[in-house]
């Protein structure tokens, strides 16, 4: 038979403060079923790509000037086709085992510039909607601060979802390999409370030794 599919994208959004939470968090925003030729969405993604590439190039030049020559095209990516700050640090350490702590701190210092290059949650949701798609909060218990994964508690997820609902989020990813049954149940309850649909995702990005593509679920209320 035929395979049914919809268009999809995952956007790493700019960090922002959420309600009463003390630390800014970056969420991953999923877009499903959109028109991939939509000019607003395409322009937003293209501009973000250009900003990010400029930051990485500036970082490479700064690291090179500090005595450790590197080129961004030479940096192996650990997550599919998405370059991450940790990839640059791993590349520097592999090429220069005796790299100074100052150089490592230099790499880390670019986290702020990279998150500022990202798309805001509000703009991301609006662009996905403009393209006729649905916006979904990916792996809600896992967010990021300065590109370091943060594990959230249920109350924190609840606070953030309240704001996301006001911004027009359509759904949340409730089925995720790392989530416990109780966590999934809590997310499904929140989805029902806010009238959101739920999705399942394996978070597979095409990388070797990173999880697995697809997942089984006995629920039937998912977009995919």
Could you tell me what each predicted segment is?
Residues 60, 65-125:
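Hydrophobic, aromatic-enriched interface-forming segments
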Residues 56, 121, 157:
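Aromatic/hydrophobic pocket-lining residues that form the small-molecule binding cavity
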Residues 1-40, 44-58, 62-83:
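Mid-domain alpha/beta scaffold segments of enzyme catalytic cores
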Residues 47-51, 116, 149-156:
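Alpha-helix N-cap and loop-to-helix initiation/capping positions
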Residues 1-36, 126-224:
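Charged catalytic cores and adjacent phosphate/nucleic-acid-binding surfaces used
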Residues 42, 107, 169-170:
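Generic signal for short, ordered secondary-structure residues
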Residues 46-47, 110-112, 147-148, 174-175:
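Short, contiguous strand/loop micro-motifs
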């Amino acid at each position: 038979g035929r395979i049914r599919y919809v268009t999809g994208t995952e956007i790493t959004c700019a960090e922002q403060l959420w309600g009463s939470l003390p630390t800014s968090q970056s969420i991953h925003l999923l877009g499903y079923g959109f028109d991939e030729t939509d000019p607003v969405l395409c322009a937003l993604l293209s501009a973000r790509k250009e900003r990010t590439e400029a930051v990485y190039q500036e970082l490479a030049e700064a690291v090179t000037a500090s005595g450790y020559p590197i080129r961004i095209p030479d940096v192996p990516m650990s997550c599919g086709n998405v370059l991450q700050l940790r990839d640059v640090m791993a590349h520097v350490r592999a090429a220069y085992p005796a790299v100074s702590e100052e150089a490592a701190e230099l790499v880390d210092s670019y986290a702020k510039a990279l998150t500022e290059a990202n798309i805001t949650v509000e703009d991301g949701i609006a662009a996905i909607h403009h393209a006729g798609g649905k916006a979904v909060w990916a792996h809600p218990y896992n967010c990021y601060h300065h590109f370091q994964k943060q594990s959230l508690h249920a109350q924190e997820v609840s606070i953030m979802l309240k704001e996301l609902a006001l911004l027009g989020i359509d759904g949340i990813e409730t089925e995720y390999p790392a989530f416990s049954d109780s966590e999934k149940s809590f997310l499904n309850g929140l989805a029902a409370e806010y009238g959101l649909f739920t999705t399942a995702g394996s978070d597979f990005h095409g990388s070797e030794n990173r999880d697995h593509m697809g997942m089984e679920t006995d629920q039937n209320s998912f977009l995919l």
